[in-house]
Amino acid sequence: MIVSNKGLLGMAVGVLTLTGVVISGFSSIQVAIADHSQNQSGGHLVAQNIKSLTIVFPSRSDSTDLQNKANNVAAFLSKMVGIPIKAQVGDETAAVEALRANRADVAFLSSRPALKAEQLANSRLYLAEVRKNYSGRYTYNSVFVVPNNSQLKSKNSPKATLEQLRGKTITFTSPTSGSGFIFPVSELVKQGFVPNRDRLDTFFSKVNYGGNYSKALDAVVRGQTDVAVVSEYALFPPYLAAENRDKVRILHKISGVPAHGIAIDDDVPVVIREKLINALLKLNKSENQQLLTNLYNSTELVRVDHDRHLQPMREALKNV
């Protein structure tokens, strides 16, 4: 929720509580409720007027049957926190809007939507995801990928390597992708090849957008583009088929892309927020880890400082 609206919304919540009115929304997103509140003994939760939490789980290319998997996580968290927790599935734009409109309290978000959630809803990241194929534990690389037989070679400096791309065709993931557009374009600007994202055609002969990691990489495999830019973890299934891995190679990499994380709205009281964070961290335990891995192939959640974690994205956006 936006800070300036707290007073008005607080009064509205009071009125709605007295009148017994319940507002439901987010109709474009599937909803499931995991209710284990009968195990909760802490009356202070009710005193703070927090009767349930809503978590948005954005759909991703490597997530299948996400609603059921999210339901299982919500059920686990509900037991740990002691109040009903709703699992909602939708895209990241809908997740940010739900936080802004006070229809959600928590969301799994990548770094750029996390910044948007901070701007619109005063939400902050408290946890980041760790994957086995992240180079920096909770940061990863943006990679320029070329055909294995390409004449383009990695040089002794980023500038020398990227200079070879002049006049070539490039396929970005999408204009909103951090590793597949924002970070690589920022690098091109820093190296002096283009002034901004609107002048990419002055350096490349053709600029394409794959729409997702798989399609961008497929363009490389099929010889339809000279280079594509994706996340390093996209070089593994399900994004890139195992039989195609030896058909491509990394030309250049940019480190420090912030891993996806978990944003919590500022309206969630500190005591509830900490209970939720501690419950989420219990997903790291061996007996619970499969619940976490099933969502997005993450192996661990770690605490992060919101500003420090997202600073690389802030800096990259300045150049783009």
Residue ranges and their predicted role:
Residues 130-181, 186-187, 191:
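A conserved helix-loop-strand patch within extracytoplasmic ligand-binding domains
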Residues 72-81, 179-209, 239-243, 316-319:
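Ligand-binding cleft/hinge of the Venus flytrap
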Residues 60-67, 169-177, 206-207, 221, ...:
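Second-shell loop/turn segments in exported
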